[in-house]
Amino acid sequence: MAHKKGTGSTRNGRDSNAKRLGVKAYGGETVTAGSILIRQRGTSVLPGINVGIGKDDTLFALTAGVVKFETIRRGLRNRKRINITAAV
């Protein structure tokens, strides 16, 4: 028989690293070609004009210009879309 109380163990003592998701370039900002605009899981924001999409759903600028967000009706719900317009 133990004469000292054993230390308990826990099954919850860990956490995952933050993935740094979110908007990296906001509306009205000037960006260069290749700049990351949004890091996301799934397509919560859709790519628009002059915007590409990576295999992990990251949106990036295909050309230099100004970031512009818009809301579009897609099916039964509204979706956000991000475009790059030419800088004037």
UniProtKB/Swiss-Prot annotation:
Superkingdom of the organism of origin: Bacteria
Positions of the UniProt region annotated as Disordered: 1-21
UniProt keyword Ribonucleoprotein present: yes
GO molecular function terms noted in the UniProt entry: structural constituent of ribosome
Cellular component terms per the entry's GO annotation: cytosolic large ribosomal subunit
InterPro entries referenced in this protein's UniProt entry, alphabetically: Ribosomal_bL27, Ribosomal_bL27_CS
Gene Ontology BP annotations: translation
NCBIfam families per record: L27
Family: Belongs to the bacterial ribosomal protein bL27 family.
PANTHER family per record: LARGE RIBOSOMAL SUBUNIT PROTEIN BL27M, RIBOSOMAL PROTEIN L27
Name this protein carries in UniProt: Large ribosomal subunit protein bL27
Native organism: Parasynechococcus marenigrum (strain WH8102)
